[in-house]
Swiss-Prot record:
Swiss-Prot/TrEMBL keywords: Actin-binding, Cell junction, Cytoplasm, Cytoskeleton, Methylation, Phosphoprotein, Synapse
Location in or out of the cell: Cytoplasm, Cytoskeleton; Synapse; Cell junction, Focal adhesion
Compositional bias of kind Basic and acidic residues: 182-202
Gene symbol of the encoding locus: WASF1
Assigned protein family: Belongs to the SCAR/WAVE family.
Source species, domain of life: Eukaryota
Identification of the protein by name: Actin-binding protein WASF1
Length: 559
């Protein structure tokens, strides 16, 4: 259906009804025809004015664009011809901070809008009948839609096209996302190396050189493998930390504990002996083989293991680990080096217990108190320890660089009474903190009031001289389990704090999701009825490699 933009009136010049009572009809028809011609000429002049007015507006806008382009060309010509690169250096900041040129030309779209309606069409539209007043029912609708749009909606077809374009764009984006996820889930296939063509030139050259000069095929292949992948002995020549020449007077068993500890501390490789591997069975020796077999020391467990080595080799490698073992306990004066050497070479010695933990100070309160390790003294000398002291409240202390290790209970081996007297005295007890300080970690006072029954014997089973391990504390500092707390805790309840924190985290996540949703909605609302933006978004999604690149030109179109 053609749309008539301009209509010239009257269409018919002579098709008119003559009034009655006219005597000269020919003269009347001539006058009516001339009057209609004049009216048509006036319509033509009016429409000519509209046409030339539109042409004038187009020419004016074109001249404005040409003038702006000429000004830009003049500025560029001046800067290009007069700029001397030897004298004036263009700073990098001017290049990076300068914005790219952006055209201010409005794209031709929405040609058939109410704002772009020409004057002749507006006059024709005004002549038409008015639609029924359905907008009166709009305030009574619950969906918020205009009532007149159910009767007539000029933007219906454009909205339908816009919805389809946006849906296609979203479908393409989802398809790309699924394809990307499928590519990530698919295992990486190794690149197939094409088979090299078979060439017998090398074989003929070998035959021409003779068997004396020709190299062996295996050696040549080995050289090619070494060139491609490195020497074959790369995995066999790793530097291993071991100690050789450990037989005779230079054996490990003949060294004192200080040199042994220093030797084990130098290790820089990982341990080559599994800590939980059972010892191999001792090899069978002949009657004339009386050479003692030194033991292999594994520092992974910090104990001496009875690991016989093979007597076939002249050297006894001792593999050590990079972690230095704990220093052995000080030897009493009654023990000599010869007795130690004899005890290490003859029979497997008992495992050496780990050293006791260092005494904790007032500012170092471990979260879990380690169980006390019994000393290696005679069974009749062990003195019952006093009841544990309830740790008073201390303030939070700065983090300690290294926590005290928790020692495990080891069997106590009895020693002679002479060796017990040569032992050094136990370390003094740690000083008690002032009563107004809180501990760095919460410790239950009632749990500490009951010591383990297996660690402290009764006083009746410990006769002889007493070796006090810790001075008895005054009874005022010992808090029994049945006594309630005197000072109520002012700290907030942990469950409430955690619940508040979790609630805040949930609210933060919810707010973030709502903000992202609003941003997406605002982004879609900014599109409005911009055909160029909708098409550019679809083209960007179709031709972009990644999902993020689909929004790169949206801001340029909207600004």
């Amino acid at each position: 259906m053609p749309l008539v933009k301009r209509n010239i009136d009257p269409r018919h010049l002579c098709h008119t009804a003559l009034p009655r009572g006219i005597k000269n009809e020919l003269e009347c028809v001539t006058n009516i025809s001339l009057a209609n011609i004049i009216r048509q000429l006036s319509s033509l002049s009016k429409y000519a004015e509209d046409i030339f007015g539109e042409l004038f507006n187009e020419a004016h806008s074109f001249s404005f664009r040409v003038n702006s382009l000429q000004e830009r060309v003049d500025r560029l010509s001046v800067s290009v011809t007069q700029l001397d690169p030897k004298e004036e250096e263009l700073s990098l900041q001017d290049i990076t901070m300068r914005k790219a040129f952006r055209s201010s030309t409005i794209q031709d779209q929405q040609l058939f809008d109410r704002k772009t309606l020409p004057i002749p069409l507006q006059e024709t539209y005004d002549v038409c009948e008015q639609p029924p007043p359905l907008n009166i029912l709009t305030p009574y609708r619950d969906d918020g839609k205009e009532g007149l749009k159910f009767y007539t909606n000029p933007s219906y077809f454009f909205d339908l096209w816009k919805e389809k374009m946006l849906q296609d764009t979203e479908d393409k984006r989802k398809e790309k996302r699924k394809q990307k996820q499928k590519n990530l889930d698919r295992p990486h296939e190794p690149e197939k190396v094409p088979r090299a063509p078979h060439d017998r030139r090398r074989e003929w050259q070998k035959l021409a050189q003779g068997p004396e000069l020709a190299e062996d095929d295996a050696n040549l292949l080995h050289k090619h493998i070494e060139v491609a992948n490195g020497p074959a002995s790369h995995f066999e020549t790793r530097p291993q930390t071991y100690v050789d020449h450990m037989d005779g007077s230079y054996s490990l068993s003949a060294l004192p504990f200080s040199q042994m500890s220093e030797l084990l501390t130098r290790a820089e490789e990982r341990v080559l002996v599994r800590p939980h591997e059972p010892p191999p069975p001792p090899p069978m020796h002949g009657a004339g083989d009386a050479k003692p077999i030194p033991t292999c020391i594994s520092s992974a467990t910090g104990l001496i293991e009875n690991r016989p080595q093979s007597p076939a080799t002249g050297r006894t490698p001792v593999f050590v680990s990079p972690t230095p073992p704990p220093p052995p306990p000080p030897l009493p004066s009654a023990l000599s080096t010869s007795s130690l050497r004899a005890s290490m070479t003859s029979t497997p010695p008992p495992p050496v217990p780990p050293p006791p933990p260092p005494p904790t100070t007032a500012l170092q309160a471990p979260a879990v108190p380690p169980p006390p390790a019994p000393l290696q003294i005679a069974p009749g000398v062990l003195h019952p320890a006093p009841p544990p002291i309830a740790p008073p409240l201390v303030q939070p202390s700065p983090p300690v660089a290294r926590a005290a290790p928790v020692c495990e209970t080891v069997p106590v081996h009895p020693l002679p009474q002479g060796e017990v007297q040569g032992l050094p005295p136990p370390p003094p007890p740690p000083p008690l903190p002032p009563p107004g300080i809180r501990p760095s970690s919460p410790v239950t006072v009632a749990a500490l009031a009951h010591p383990p029954s297996g660690l402290h014997p009764t006083p009746s089973t410990a006769p002889g001289p007493h070796v006090p391990l810790m001075p008895p504390s005054p009874p005022s500092q010992v808090t029994p389990a049945s006594e309630p707390k005197r000072h109520p805790s002012t700290l907030p309840v942990i469950s409430d704090a955690r619940s508040v924190l979790l609630e805040a985290i949930r609210k933060g996540i919810q707010l973030r999701k709502v903000e992202e949703q609003r941003e997406q909605e605002a982004k879609h609302e900014r599109i409005e009825n911009d055909v160029a933006t909708i098409l550019s978004r679809r083209i960007a999604v179709e031709y972009s490699d990644s999902e993020d690149d689909s929004e790169f030109d949206e801001v340029d179109w909207l600004e």
